[in-house]
Amino acid sequence: MKLAPNLLAAMLLAQSAAAFANGSADTIFYGGPIVTVNGKNEEVQALAIQNGKIVAVGKKHDVIKAWQAPATKIVDLNGQTLVPGFIEPHVHIIVTSYLEGLGVNLSNFALPYDTIDTISTKLRAQLKNVPAGGWLFGFGVDPSRTAPFMAELTADDLDKISTDVPIFIVNQSGHIGYVNHKAIELAGLTDNTPNPGDGGIYVKDAQGKLTGKLVEPPSYLAFMAKMPAPTEAQLLGAIKNTLNSMAATGITTVSEMSVGSNFGVDREVAIYRGIFAKNASPVRVRGYLWGQALPVGYNSIKPNDGDDWLRFIGVKYISDGSTQGLTAALNNPYFYPKDSTFSGDLNYKDGEIYGLMKPFFDQGWQLSIHSNGDKAIDQTLNNFAKLLDGNPKPQDRRLRIEHFTVNNESQVTKAVKMGVVPSFTIGHVHFWGAAFNDHLIGA
């Protein structure tokens, strides 16, 4: 049975069983603390569900009297606590599924940290699993958890693993990648190839030679285009595994922040529609279309297209990179390396990103802008202010800033006044907090 994930709204409406006429509930829960999150942090004794929605909360006697029928399932919690489903505001379901289903997991969460040699050993061991014509694909390398600190793979390092098999690695941030020279060759890049735009960079050394380091997802596209695409069955299986794992942790609604970033908007929208048409997802999805994948004048999908379970509600752009990857745009230089004068880069000029955002804003789309650094946050807030100028109900537009990592008090105040919602990825602070504080940006 699917339970409606928007428990909070239902509980706010359902103040007591007496608020409803008698009915026939599908399920009634009782026997443990039932947390309503109704503003007063109240707990109730019982909860009734009908047709996948909460129809009553209140005292056990009242709920059972009003809603129990012969076919009603009665669930005794036996002291366990029932809480609203968790809402995960920022995920990349297809990206995650693609990486975890088809790539080598190189994540290292504990001491001792990896070195370039240990990472290379892990990759070398996977060569035997690469089919003819295939690529060795990995993810999760984290320079902030590599010894020495911030050590990164190069094309030369990856060539030591193989010069025949193309290798492509995405690091833990998702904003930086590494390739060997075989991959560079197959992608058709040379030392004279210009950067792809939208913030993407093919990093070169002092002599103008490609190093194998890629900055921002647009720089991945030339390589992904040459990689064997997963079959529909492989991709759907991986996506369903991801959705099921989310549900197993209590997550009932997610915001998918990159629809179209891997296989194009139309294909990824079709993938989601296919999954939900078969009732194969245990969680609800709210989709944000990947702005960089949208052609000028795109209008194939209208704002809020979908239903209660799957709805496409917004468009997302990325204004800077990752803090841990030293690519977020700051107003002051990073602490690393020592005496650095580098403060990151904006992916777009002010007028450029405003011009991309405005047509979708005018169509009624919600907008979400990835901004980690305070310089990027300034740019986004200023552009939002221009968009909202003359809008009588800015709160209806649900403008979001993703991450909002390196911020200051004036930016918080400005966001509040404008009705802009910072969407914090607090897990980043937990995971990279020590690196942020001790090495990269300070307290």
Model-derived segments and spans:
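Secondary-structure transition/capping motifs at alpha-helix termini
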Residues: 274-284, 304-310, 362-363, 385-397, ...
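Divalent metal-binding segments
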Residues: 23-30, 35, 39-298, 317, ...
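Bacterial N-terminal signal peptides that target proteins for export
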Residues: 1-7
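N-terminal signal peptide c-region/cleavage motif recognized by signal peptidases
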Residues: 14-16
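Non-cysteine beta-strand/loop elements that form the S-adenosyl-L-methionine
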Residues: 309-327, 420-429
